[in-house]
Design a protein with these regions (language model features):
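Glycine-centered secondary-structure boundary/capping sites
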Residues: 6, 25, 108-109
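Glycine-rich phosphate-binding loop used to anchor ATP phosphates in small-molecule kinases
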Residues: 13-81, 121-133, 148
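C-terminal accessory "lid"/substrate-recognition subdomains
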Residues: 50-58, 62, 93-226
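Single conserved hydrophobic/aromatic residue that forms the stacking wall/gate
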Residues: 1-7, 11
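Conserved phosphate-donor/acceptor-positioning beta-strand/loop module used by diverse small-molecule
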Residues: 66-67, 79-104
């Protein structure tokens, strides 16, 4: 609806202000999205809602944002320009639908039909807002199931990590030590000059090997610039 799109634009502008303020001053306001009852108990807001905005109380080394809009670029907003390292974590679309249907029916009490309607209602935003961000990211981790997910609307189980591969794509492969990564991650291989494929169960290891030195470099560069 026009109203929901308007609220979405307001949220993105708030997020852009947060990124801009942190890049200029090293501080900004932040909030959490509540996914479940555990987070409700921790942060005091109902699942499906955001907590109130808060301001950083102490100096920090970096800002970590986890959400759906961290690399949005359109005619009015450019979030991607403020992020030093943009990471995309996304399953192939059928797996994404399976995960959403199971999560919303099992944990939130929705019917499959209601979740399907939500997916269809959000398709325009998915195509025009979500997908383009993965072109802006520096590294993408895409989970690909190796079992049949051809009809996600009737899938009885979510494919496990052992039933999946993960494709890791680097926007700029220069300086990436692919032979080292392949040697450290068992059963991995390069599928393109900028991509490596790993077993689904090795995702955590791959993230540690790839991201730890990159984040350490960002922190060191920031400290030297002060």
């Amino acid at each position: 609806t026009a109203r929901s799109r308007g609220l979405g634009d307001v949220y993105k502008r708030q997020l852009e202000n947060c990124f801009r303020n942190y890049s200029e001053k090293g501080t900004c306001r932040y909030r959490h999205y509540i996914h479940n009852s555990n987070e409700e108990n921790l942060y005091g807001a109902k699942p499906g809602n955001f907590t109130k905005w808060k301001k950083f109380e102490e100096p920090s080394d970096l800002l970590f944002y986890e959400g759906l809009h961290g690399a949005v670029v359109n005619e009015e907003i450019n979030l991607a320009r403020y992020a030093d390292l943009k990471i995309g974590v996304v399953p192939v679309i059928n797996l994404e639908w399976i995960q959403k249907i199971h999560r919303d029916t099992d944990s939130r009490g929705y019917s499959t039909e209601a979740v399907t309607d939500t997916i269809l209602r959000r398709m325009h935003a998915y195509v025009h807002c979500i997908c383009p961000q993965f072109t802006e990211t520096d590294i993408n981790f895409q989970r690909v199931p190796v079992v049949d997910t051809s009809n996600p609307l009737v899938a009885r189980w979510i494919p496990t990590a052992d039933e999946s591969l993960v494709v890791i794509r680097f926007k700029d492969p220069h300086g990436i030590d692919f032979p080292y990564l392949v040697s450290m991650i068992h059963d991995s291989w390069m599928s393109r000059a900028n991509s490596i494929v790993i077993p689904g169960g090795k995702l955590d290891l791959a993230m540690q090997l790839i991201l730890t030195p990159l984040i350490g470099r960002l922190v060191n560069q920031a400290k030297r610039a002060i």
